[in-house]
From Swiss-Prot:
GO CC, alphabetical: cytosol
Subunit organization: Monomer.
NCBIfam families (UniProt xref): ileS
UniProt gene name: ileS
Uppermost EC category: ligase
Gene Ontology molecular function, alphabetical: aminoacyl-tRNA deacylase activity; ATP binding; isoleucine-tRNA ligase activity; tRNA binding; zinc ion binding
Main location: cytoplasm
Protein name as annotated: Isoleucine--tRNA ligase
């Protein structure tokens, strides 16, 4: 008996069903490195329009976490998609290498008493070691880039470039020295940037403190009263008793009503609206004697509770009635608004009291509290206030308070002499940096759009930028200050260039070991060489000035403006922010055309990842157990504009999506294995109707996906690929196509037409998925191109052949698909009843009206192939009510080869188990098909 199975064109491919990703992926990475794929892509893309995604440098400290993986995978998807879209899209990874965390690591390992030059040497070595660790982990994620030549902020050329960027800002007039309150961490021993501050709950003492009036007659006049007969106190409320030794003024709102309250032994000055709450807090009875506006109390002097000095009233619009007394105590060294108020009222910088030292202790010469830690001094200060009779109430409150992001310890505002970039100082063209930056925000595209208003608000409300730090491991601020006047050397910009040249050769150590006389000659005796270093946000914030201008081999030759910066949403106050300020200061515009922000990773319940919750997922573990491809697909399938949920269950669902795509790809490869596009292609006009429809819906997918890539909406692409593989192909086109692919003659026009369509579909699918499923696309591409050292990334998105009348074709086939879906439901009901197994055991009768009838009639004899039944009869229904689809089990004979049930099985006596169609396909001229 003949084995007709061997006569079928059964699919065959070297592309395995199982991805076995954890084992196979390292091999692809090794192949890319061996082939120098990144360099090949650069060569292939030379001369195309440029697209530059400038890498925001991760900090060179510790292994990668999921946030790192998310960020780098998103960048890789964008760079790959831009390459496939026809751009020259280089990707130069970078690392942020200076700063306190690395210095802290070195101190922990080697102790705090090392010489400064040794600290810098160890920091540089540690950062280099961390870069190598992170680099390997990024490469394992399938990220393509110039990994052999990354940019590091500690590269000598970049350190020199940073000094030159600072020189540009000095030359423009933005940089000044000033005494201002800055975020200060006692553990860091340094000022902190806004981006290094986080908020957490803190329990603080809350005290109500009376300041005795030093000018009772003026106070009486303000309230329209005769001279007062007993003491009067203005009462303040504060949660920072430690600032009271530095008090130098009181603030009242000019428009608020203030009351003079008689409590028996003395008068209290309180905001009128808060009198009741205050008296209850103090356990006192009292009556309001008189009221006046805050403006009437301007400059009235009160006495410090325990020091012999005055605290005048300064008016301030920032005073509120939300809590407290309506009177604010002002310690200008330890509060931004306090500082601004006192300076606006004529207080000179030299007059501002700064008793708190950098380590958190009071200066030794401070009366009563000298040498004490400020936090430990709070109860001592409260006791002193009680002793002098000025403590009216005390309590404990829990409130949100600023903390150091590294040490998790409370911060203070502390006025120190620092270097600043001025936000509101007009420069040569009359504009301020704030104005330039706000215009820059408005000119930038944001993904998602809400990022614009967020960054705009931050720029509008931010203070001057404190760019100096008091640390060892950082790029120096190479200034010489006159020892008597404190002024910068008149040749500062010129001297900075000389320093930059030395740093270019020797690194930052060139400045720290420099003898001033080498540059200043005889003038050196008059000048002091400062030791401050630059804020690390200035490091990364100026990479557009040196990395993109060509300090790196892949410099963006068109200039320092990148097409895109992409980071987490916290970088609105970090890298996006500092880059915007430096770009606008130096070039007058942002260093980027667009900003893309992504959210943070959370677990399935929306909780942050933490070891204590046990919900941490490491990218290394996912790569080892499931494959980096699954992590890439998870990133792409999630809407990154908000929080990104991840868990074992979520990743398992991603695996199912991957399997669907892989199985579809395997079918396509298996059924085009014997097809050569150069020899076997069938012209489009000779394709069957359903093949032209498949071309049309593939074109729709390609157009939509390419548009979504351009908009960075990758989750829409993954959704579309799922629908395409599962519904358009798997449940429709490929399902119908199997009969033609397997049963017609191998070289028949009907089969070759199908294979031509499948070849175009495969090319399209592979290139659309390549930015996301990079390993799998490469694996499939190798199967398509055996023996060639080729890569899908050396090509561009597939150009599908054009065809006329596509809209009408699609509309007709959408109707056919809708009818087919209803027919399959009817057959499924028959299967559920146990009357048929496969759909080929059924016969259909379709009674349809108008458009449906016309669409199905257009299929002619091929109708049964579309419905996947052995027979399909079409009748025209008189009305919608008369429409029906009826399925019945076939009573005919099953063909051994094609499994259709027909009356002509055995028609050919030599092949008694074959239907006439199969006999003709095997031994005759072969069947003719026109539609399916």
């Amino acid at each position: 008996m003949a084995d007709y199975r061997k006569t079928l064109n059964l699919p065959d491919t070297a592309f395995p069903m199982r991805g076995d990703l954890p084992k196979r992926e390292p091999g692809w990475i090794a192949a890319w490195q061996q082939q120098k794929l990144y360099q090949k892509i650069r060569k292939a893309a030379a001369g195309r329009p440029k697209f530059v995604l400038h890498d925001g440098p991760p900090y060179a400290n510790g292994n990668l976490h999921l946030g790192h993986a998310l960020n780098k995978i998103l960048k890789d998807i964008i760079v790959r998609s831009k390459t496939l879209a026809g751009f020259d899209a280089p990707y130069v990874p970078g690392w942020d290498c200076h700063g306190l965390p690395i210095e802290h690591k070195v101190e922990v390992t080697h102790g705090k008493n090392l010489p400064a030059d040794k600290v810098r040497e160890l920091c540089r070595a540690y950062a280099a070691e961390q870069v190598e660790i992170q680099k390997k982990e990024f490469i394992r994620l399938g990220v393509l880039g110039d990994w052999d030549n990354p940019y590091l902020t500690m590269n000598f050329a970049n350190e020199a470039g940073e000094v030159r960027a600072l020189a540009e800002m000095v030359k423009a007039g933005y940089v000044f020295k000033g005494l201002k309150p800055v975020n200060w961490c006692f553990d860091c021993g340094s000022a902190l940037a806004e981006a290094e501050v986080e908020y957490a709950d803190k329990v603080s003492p809350a005290v109500d403190v009376g300041f005795p009036c030093a000018e009772p007659d003026r106070l009486a006049d303000a309230f329209g009263l005769a001279p007062l007969t007993k003491p009067a106190l203005a009462v303040i409320w504060t949660t920072t008793p430690w600032t009271i030794p530095a008090n130098q003024a009181l603030n009242m709102h000019p428009e608020f009503d203030y009351a003079l309250v008689d409590t028996g032994e003395r008068y209290l000055v309180l905001a009128h609206d808060l009198v009741g709450a205050c008296l209850e807090r103090y356990g006192l009875n009292g009556r309001i004697v008189a009221t006046c506006k805050g403006a009437a109390l301007d400059r009235v002097a009160f006495r410090h509770p325990f020091y012999d000095r005055l605290s005048p009233v300064f008016l301030g619009d920032y005073v509120t009635l939300d809590a407290g007394t309506g009177v604010v105590h002002s310690a200008p060294a330890y509060g931004l608004e306090d500082f601004q108020s006192c300076r606006a009222n004529g207080m000179q910088s030299d007059d501002i009291l700064t008793p708190v030292m950098g380590d958190g202790r009071y200066a030794p010469d401070l009366p009563f509290f000298g040498g004490m830690n400020i936090w430990k001094a709070n109860p001592e200060i409260t006791a002193k206030l009680r002793e002098v009779g000025c403590l009216l109430a005390e309590a404990k409150i829990t409130h949100s308070y600023m903390h150091c992001w590294r040490h998790k310890t409370p911060l203070i505002y502390r006025a120190t002499a620092q270097w600043f970039v001025g936000m509101d100082k007009p420069v040569a063209d009359g504009s301020t940096l704030r104005e330039r930056a706000l215009r820059g925000v408005e000119a930038t595209r944001f993904f998602p759009a809400w990022g614009q208003s967020r960054l705009h608000a931050m720029i509008a409300n931010r203070p001057d930028w404190c760019i100096s730090r008091q640390r060892n491991w950082g790029v120096p601020i190479p200034f010489f200050l006159h020892k008597e006047t404190g002024e910068l050397h008149p040749r500062t910009v010129e001297l900075m260039e000389e320093v930059a040249k030395r740093i270019e050769q020797e690194g930052i150590e060139a400045w720290f070991k420099l003898d001033a006389a080498e540059l200043l000659g005889a003038e050196a005796a008059q000048y002091e060489k400062i030791s401050d270093t630059l804020d690390v946000w200035f490091d990364s914030g100026t990479t557009h000035w040196h990395v993109l201008r060509g300090s790196h081999n892949d410099g963006h030759v068109e200039g320092p403006r990148a097409d895109l910066y992409l980071e987490g949403s916290d970088q609105h106050r970090g890298w996006f922010h500092s880059s915007l300020l430096t770009g606008c200061a130096i070039d007058g515009h942002p260093p980027y055309n667009a900003l893309l922000t992504h959210g943070f990773t959370v677990d399935q319940q929306g909780r942050k990842m933490s070891k204590s919750l046990g919900n941490t997922i490491l990218p290394q573990e996912v790569s080892e157990k499931m494959g980096a491809e699954i992590l890439r697909l998870w990133v792409a399938s999630t809407d990154y504009s908000g929080e990104l949920s991840i868990s074992k269950e979520i990743l398992d669902r991603v695996v199912e999506v991957y399997r669907r795509v892989r199985n579809t790809l395997r079918f396509l490869l298996a059924n085009t294995a014997d097809f050569d596009i150069a020899k076997d292609a069938v012209p489009l006009e000779q394709w069957l109707d359903i093949d032209r429809y498949a071309l049309a819906f593939t074109r729709q997918l390609a157009q939509q996906a390419e548009a979504d890539y351009a908009r960075f909406e990758f989750h829409r692409i993954v959704q579309a690929l799922q629908v395409f593989c599962a519904e358009d192909l798997g449940a429709f086109y490929l399902d119908i196509l199997k009969d033609r692919l397997y049963t017609t003659a191998a070289g028949s026009q009907a089969r070759r037409a199908a294979q031509t369509a499948l070849w175009h579909i495969t090319q399209t699918l592979l290139k659309l998925m390549a930015p996301i499923l990079s390993f799998t696309a490469e694996e499939a591409w190798a199967v398509l191109n055996p023996g060639k050292e080729d890569s899908v990334m050396l090509h561009t998105f597939h150009a599908l052949p054009a065809q006329e009348g596509e809209a009408g074709l699609v509309a007709r086939w959408e109707t056919i698909r809708a009818v087919r879906a209803e027919a399959l439901k009817v057959i499924e009901a028959l299967r559920t009843e146990g009357k048929v197994g496969a759909s080929l055991q059924a016969e259909l009768e379709l009674r349809l009206t108008a458009d449906k009838y016309t669409a199905m009639q257009s299929l002619g004899e091929d109708l049964r192939f579309v419905t996947m039944t052995s027979r399909a009869t079409l009748l025209e229904a008189a009305s919608a009510e008369a429409e029906a689809i009826v399925a019945t089990p076939s009573a005919r004979t099953k063909c051994e080869r094609c499994w259709h049930y027909t009356d002509d099985v055995g028609h050919n006596a030599e092949h008694p188990t074959l239907c006439a169609r199969c006999a003709d396909n095997l031994y005759g001229a072969g069947e003719t098909r026109t539609h399916a």
